[in-house]
Amino acid sequence: MLARPTLVIALLATSVNMSPSSQEAWTPVTIPPDALRAHVQALAGEIGERNTFRPQALRRAADYIERAWRTQGYAVTRQEYALGPDTWANLEITRRGRENPDDVILVGAHYDSVIGSPGANDNATGVAALLELSRLAAARAQGKTVRFVAFVNEEPPHFQTAQMGSHVYAKQARARGDRIRAMLSLETLGYYSEASGSQVFPFPSVLYRLFYPDRGNFVLFVSNLGSRPLLRQAVESFRAQSDFPVESIATFELVPGVDWSDHGSFWAEGYPALMVTDTALYRYPYYHTEQDTPEKVNYGALARVVDGLAGMLWALGR
């Protein structure tokens, strides 16, 4: 997951400040918080910890996602790969574009959890958002093709290795010549607070406070320098469709932590990609613990974030 940049020059030079811009007509949607709650409860409450050390639970999570997508009317593709004696799978669905079907907008979230944690916020919230965004997309054909992918094995010990699900996916996409115009990684999205001091920062924290709020009430968009045009378009589109607070940062890939999720796999293959997050360990006190349980998630705030993401996705996919 995410760590904010520790290089002050990176923050000063590349933090992105944007104002809303007009978009073409979009019918606003309201995601029911209870729909998101049901997904998080199923994954983190009923299935619980899900990783290669609990293989049955990890497969149950994959089956849950596949059933949800089939119910929405999609054909589900499993991208399987071997890891030791077992086989694991990324799951993919596609809403083919009308005018520019070879141009792809990809939305992804990992469905495994870290060892010892039921993974409600990290990352059942990301999967819940993924499932609700795909449900909306099923009824709205766009100019570009939109893919939704549930990635396996994002967490350690597979993180940033050749066995990481998104690494396998991105590498094969590049080998096929896929024209992925934007990749959006939905990562740890469900914890928000209006309390002063609820948002913390890495050293030197005093400088970060010059640019970012000390209340953890916002969603953060993160990009590398090469993805700045995508970041600008995404944040402007989000703000045009939602009044939920959003902050953004574009910085160097060498800054520790900036590539700590599935978007990093796409940067490695030269694709433009963003992470959308609540900032995880810099706000969420239960990050990577056994206390990361469904009741910790702010479902009302999460629903507002997904509302904004739905409008943003529509704008990117035109």
Identify what each model region corresponds to:
Residues 38-98, 247-249:
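A non-catalytic alpha/beta surface segment that caps or lines the substrate-entry region
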Residues 43, 79-81, 95-97, 108-112, ...:
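Active-site-proximal beta-strand/loop segments in catalytic clefts of secreted hydrolases
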Residues 114-232, 258:
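Acidic/histidine-rich catalytic neighborhood of metal-dependent amide-processing enzymes
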